Amino acid sequence: RVRSSAASDVYKRQGSIKEEHYFSGVAPRAELIMVKLAPAKKYNRKIWGITEDVDCYQETNILLGIEYILSVAARLNRPLVLCIGMGSSQGAHEGHSMFATWLNYLCTIPRIGICVSAGNEGNKGRHYSGTFNPERNTDTFELRVGEADKNFFLEIWQNAPCRVMVEFTSPTGEIVYSIFPRFDECREYSFIFCPTRIFINNIILEEETGEQLILVRFEDAFSGIWTIRVTAIDDIFCEFNAWLPSGNIISEETYFLRPNPYTTITSPGNSRNPLTVGAYNQLSGSILISSSRGYTPSNLVKPDIVAPGYALPCPVRNQAFGVASGTGAAAAHTAGIIALLMEWAVEKRNYMTITGRDINLSLIHIS
């Protein structure tokens, strides 16, 4: 999987730092460990249609970076607060990925706290959900593709035990008829009146979740309105979800015409144990419209808390300062609060075996 940078939804540079502009972080005496991730490899970018100018990282490199941070904390014998300010809309959003499982485990180890940004997908129009019942076994929705987005992917997830097939209608009116689920097969479809090719994996049993995944990759996508028709094979009550890529992997000109702003928390923010942080405007008290929303498809309550995430002052390169907005900034603010709690618990020997789960519940109780 690939993950885009989600450190802030809005960032503004405001000039050089002067004496009157000095400011302090939440935990100014904390020591920082920063890991510069290697960009995603070219073959991964090609498969997923991600251009070279987009900040994007492989999950394996993120895991390696976290492992390095853990080794430094163990060598220094100090408590650790891990802040993850990036995410991905790939996956079933259930928190069952290898990355999520590992973070769940780390949260049970004493003296390790983890906070994750919820994502900034609340108002991007990149999630659609539909339902089936015995009287209504089809659902049709529209995808608007912008001029700038030639290569991208779409994931449709169907909860077990229901099975679905899918049809596509291009902006020129050409139809790709019923594509039934298979175990391991990728089909390629082309069109006469537009140059688009689409590659479809309709996987009946996705290996991490056991649910049905329809992975659609567009190559040289024709701009306009694409119509997608999903039909349930089984006459039972069930629900499906469709997600487009998150962050700046695609432009804001590509979106669903009837989106659902809920269930937009990016992975690993949908993990059970890490503290998932949304963002609110601390000046007005309102939730940021871009802040991703819960719950997860299995009704796990996420995000856990919201934190200040509007125009937070921050230092930047070249002795300058700026402001950042979004759930990444809110997660960083929360990481400072967790560091202060770690100081009270571990350094001052009030609760030496405190875990990430203990910290999460403490913050939820006092929020």
Pin down the residues of each PLM region.
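Single conserved hydrophobic/aromatic residue that forms the stacking wall/gate
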Residues: 1-11, 364-365
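Structural recognition of the beta-strand scaffold that forms the well-ordered cores
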Residues: 31-35, 80-84, 113-116, 275-278, ...
